[in-house]
Swiss-Prot record:
Entry's family note: Belongs to the IspG family.
Reaction equation(s) it catalyzes: (2E)-4-hydroxy-3-methylbut-2-enyl diphosphate + oxidized [flavodoxin] + H2O + 2 H(+) = 2-C-methyl-D-erythritol 2,4-cyclic diphosphate + reduced [flavodoxin]
Gene: ispG
Name listed for the protein in its UniProt record: 4-hydroxy-3-methylbut-2-en-1-yl diphosphate synthase (flavodoxin)
Cofactor(s) the record lists: [4Fe-4S] cluster
A GO molecular function held by the record: 4 iron, 4 sulfur cluster binding
EC number: 1.17.7.3
Alphabetical list of InterPro entries matching this protein: Dihydropteroate_synth-like_sf, IspG_bac, IspG_bac-typ, NO2/SO3_Rdtase_4Fe4S_sf
A Pfam family recorded for this sequence: GcpE
Key words, A-Z: 4Fe-4S, Iron, Iron-sulfur, Isoprene biosynthesis, Metal-binding, Oxidoreductase
Length: 421
């Protein structure tokens, strides 16, 4: 059973290294490191981990001479590890000086992120911005003009507030702040293009920390330009709050066809892997039917009929196993990301959901006969029982992948046939 994702806004297509963004390209998942970039080994390792998790573009902080001096080394380390993720340099305050003093850094990055709110004020700020754009032109790099609510150009914001105060019926302050974000992004994009940067190499973002503000800003930004757009709720927070807030904001915009790349800005729990933000971004796109990254595991939430936790443990085990296999499977079994596996806990919905999946198992609920029928492509093929249900079901999933997505497999042929040349 499949669903069709939403359409896409028509926009220009940018190129970040080998990754296309915007136009007809898939929505790109990206992430950001939290290591000290001056520590090249640690930063390269975290970039590699994020890339292995599925991040297609990774941003690193470039905030000091020590950091800028190590960017080229980070790129070389990644190349040696076989990591192809393009690197984005996140510049604030001193980006012009760092790009000038460290040309190897300028060359090694695939995209520069420039925040107009902290480049500088007046003529000096204009000169710094112009230098960074000229560097992007010289080295053929894309530029994200990333405006942020927390570092908005206050001169612009104050001017718009003053103009609003003179209106017969002033607009709410939040509406003016939203407009200031949009104007800042569009005006600076126009400056960059005026300096000679191709409009195809411009990506815009307007980051805020509240869901309704983000939706309103991006709807208007999308209406007023044809640049590729980077979506993300800044400072989304920790845990379930951060996941829910990001999902709520991004899903609305993506459903309207707005957004060409996304980043989920989660604050990791102490000791938690940075890769969680990548998984959440992928799952937003996959659950909306926009992209597929990992075989989907359908599992029931459990109820009074499922007093055993075995079905939950099996669902978790299968989901973890499939995700672990994807770095290898992605190359060996084209199309396997479309696989749907069902792990159900009782007879109420178990057989029905299992039949709709590619491979499904209906485990026994409370009071049911302790056997688990397995369905493959809608047909019951075997009934499992005993202590090795988990191992046997995993082996069935493995065999299905090899048969259907391996060399000569029917689903592999179908996937290759529909992929553009």
């Amino acid at each position: 059973m499949s669903s069709t994702g939403p359409g896409r806004r028509v926009c220009r297509q940018a190129r970040i290294g080998h990754v296309l963004m915007g136009g007809t390209a898939p929505v790109v998942v990206q992430s950001m490191t939290n290591t000290d970039t001056a520590d090249a080994a640690a930063t390269a390792l975290q970039v590699f981990d994020l890339w292995q998790a599925g991040s297609e573009v990774v941003r690193i902080t470039v905030n000091s001479p020590e950091a800028a001096a190590r960017v080229a080394e980070i790129r070389l380390r990644l190349d040696d590890m076989g990591c192809t993720a393009p690197l984005v340099g996140d510049f604030h305050f001193n980006g012009d000086r760092l790009l000038r003093d460290y040309p190897d850094c300028a060359r090694a990055l695939a995209k520069y992120r420039i925040n107009p709110g902290n480049v500088g004020k007046g003529a000096k700020g204009d000169d710094k911005f112009a230098f960074m754009i000229r560097q992007a032109i010289e080295y053929d790099k894309a530029v994200r003009i990333g405006v942020n609510w927390g570092s908005l150009d206050q001169t612009l914001a104050n001017r718009l507030m003053d103009e609003n105060a003179r209106r017969p019926h002033p607009l709410p302050a939040e509406a003016i702040m939203r407009e200031a974000l949009i104007i800042s992004a569009l005006d600076n994009a126009e400056k960059a293009v005026g300096l000679g940067l191709s409009p195809d190499q411009v990506i815009l973002s307007c980051k805020v920390s509240h869901v309704q503000d983000l939706i309103a800003v991006y709807r208007e930004l999308a209406r007023r330009c044809d640049y590729a757009l980077h979506l993300g709720l800044t400072e989304a927070g920790m845990g379930s709050k951060g996941i829910v807030a990001s999902t709520a904001a991004l899903s609305v915009l993506l459903q309207e066809g707005i957004g060409d790349t996304i980043r989920v800005s989660l604050t990791p729990e102490p000791g938690e892997s940075r890769t969680k933000e990548v998984v959440v971004a992928q799952e937003i796109l996959q659950t909306m039917g926009i992209r597929s990254f990992t075989p989907l595991v359908t599992a029931c939430p459990g109820c009074g009929r499922t007093t055993s936790t075995f079905f939950q443990e099996l669902a978790q085990r299968i989901q973890g196993y499939l995700r672990e296999q994807m770095p290898l499977w992605r190359a060996e079994y084209p199309g396997v990301e479309m696989l749907n596996v069902a792990v159900m806990g009782c007879v109420v919905n178990g057989p029905g959901e299992s039949k709709l999946a590619d491979v499904g198992i209906s485990l026994p609920g409370t009071g049911e006969v302790p056997v688990a029928p397995v369905y493959v492509d809608g047909e019951k093929t075997v009934t499992l029982k005993g202590e090795r249900i988990a191992e046997e079901f995993q082996a069935i999933v493995d065999a299905y992948v090899r048969k259907n997505y391996g060399e000569g497999g029917a689903k592999r042929r179908r996937v290759i046939a529909v992929r553009p040349a």
